[in-house]
Amino acid sequence: MDVFKQSEVWFVIGSQNLYGPKTLQQVMDNAHQVVNSLNNEAGLPVKLVLKPLVTTPDEITALCREANYDTACIGIMTWLHTFSPAKMWIGGLSILNKPLLQFHTQFNAQIPWKTMDMDFMNLNHTAHGGREFGFIGARMRQQHSVITGHWQDKEAHQRIGQWMRVAAAKQESQQLKVARFGDNMREVAVTEGDKVAAQIQFGYSVNAYGIGDLVAVVDAVSKGDIDTLVEEYEATYRFTDAVKLNGDKRENLLDAARIELGMTRFLEQGGFKAFTTNFENLYGLKQLPGLAVQRLMQQGYGFGGEGDWKTAALLRILKVMGTGLKGGTSFMEDYTYNFQPGNDLVVGSHMLEVCPSIAKEEKPLLDVQHLGIGGKADPARLIFSTPAGPALNASLIDMGNRFRLLVNVVDTVEQPHPLPKLPVARAIWQAQPSLATAAEAWIIAGGAHHTVFSQAVGVDELRLYAEMHGIEFLLIDNDTTLPAFKNEIRWNEVYYQLNR
């Protein structure tokens, strides 16, 4: 999955005609060098496109209008090389609906102490122009990001790359379609929510489809296509004896392949990039989709169990953010605890649906075993563990008057003991700052039992995603204390009530 190839970020230099053509030409010459260097040496995920210098209100407004309607443009990155009077930007910024990044840099890294004169000062005063631009953003209450640092600095490169990933995720959010196969699990609260409010806030649409709509596509899958897919399984995974040729669960594997092909075709035909299932809505399917869901997640689809459309959408968005990064991202659920002094652990898993992108094993184990829920035939699934390393769990919840993005930083650990009787994929982690504080804070904040678990995407990206959408962001990490966390929730409640 490479969602960045067709995307671009516009690099825009603001100035004014007061400087004269010679200075403005020097500004553009410097801009060409900066953009070429960033594109070729900074490892950015999205290409920068240098736009013509803007020096008048009409030019700025025209450029912002063009950015809004250019589907390749996922955001604008500005550099105030000189001074650009910010009243000129009001018209353009008032209509801009793409993410905005102010790169507070300058062409020279160090001051030429022996030769610096006023001509040099007037040409290289980002320190001056950047503050003017920042004021108008603050005055207009417009969300925009600021990154300060020299354009050859590696930390600046990393932060620009993070911003690009989040800008791409926002673009994906605005065009995302989520399919719900069946409805919400009966009587479950947190997986519900206001889909209209979500579409207004994030842009993605959520629509339900009767399970019969999916079954019709599944039943139309040919035997030849099933055989071809099973050959792919055999090349990709380790098989238990039960699912090998002539094994007593081989037919279950063939049924799972049929379901995967049918689901894939349904999603592709509808342009869906995220979906949900529900074990209470399986009429016409021979088994709960497990293997199919796992493989679709690995291909970049978002997924939520029991009709959880918010988690499905969030998973797709994090898949986009994490494209090309080390580590995977999966649907997850806190399942059970290990209470032990000095070694409190959480086992995360689900009935079947954990994404192989987080697998430690090069070839996960493919098996068919009994599932005591759903009332269907034994489903196929991939079984694996997760490598040690930093990770996070994220949950998007509907608080009625706002959406809340809740994140807990965790440390994934190696599985300390074999689990010979647990036939599902899993991840094991230590929650920051401790299991007790993390669990209590999560529960107090109303965090869902479903999460998006990621070893690829970090806190900074999710905080920025929340800022871009104007939603609440709460973080549980090593710096969290419960009194301060509770106070933050109280203050946020007041802020969002007043800011409606």
From Swiss-Prot:
Q: In which pathway does this enzyme or protein participate?
A: Carbohydrate degradation; L-arabinose degradation via L-ribulose; D-xylulose 5-phosphate from L-arabinose (bacterial route): step 1/3
Question: SUPFAM superfamilies under this entry?
Answer: FucI/AraA C-terminal domain-like, FucI/AraA N-terminal and middle domains
Q: Which GO terms describe its biological process?
A: L-arabinose catabolic process to xylulose 5-phosphate
User: Which Pfam families does the record match to this protein?
Assistant: AraA_central, AraA_N, Arabinose_Iso_C
Which reaction(s) are listed as its catalytic activity?
Answer: beta-L-arabinopyranose = L-ribulose
Q: Which Gene3D superfamilies match?
A: 3.40.50.10940
Q: Which UniProt keywords apply?
A: Arabinose catabolism, Carbohydrate metabolism, Isomerase, Manganese, Metal-binding
Indicate whether Isomerase appears among the record's keywords.
yes
An annotated GO cellular component: cytosol
Q: What's the EC number here?
A: 5.3.1.4
An example of a GO molecular function for this protein is: L-arabinose isomerase activity
Instruction: Read off the InterPro entries from this record.
Output: Ara_Isoase_C, AraA_central, AraA_N, AraA_N_sf, Fuc/Ara_isomerase_C, Fucose_isomerase_N/cen_sf, Lara_isomerase
The record describes how the cofactor is bound as: Binds 1 Mn(2+) ion per subunit.
Residues at which Mn(2+) binds = E306, E333, H350, H450
Q: Which HAMAP family match?
A: Arabinose_Isome
| Role summary | Catalyzes the conversion of L-arabinose to L-ribulose.
The entry describes its oligomerization and partners as: Homohexamer.
The family classification in the record reads: Belongs to the arabinose isomerase family.
Protein name, UniProt field: L-arabinose isomerase
Q: What is the taxonomic lineage of the source species?
A: Bacteria, Pseudomonadati, Pseudomonadota, Gammaproteobacteria, Enterobacterales
Gene encoding this chain? araA
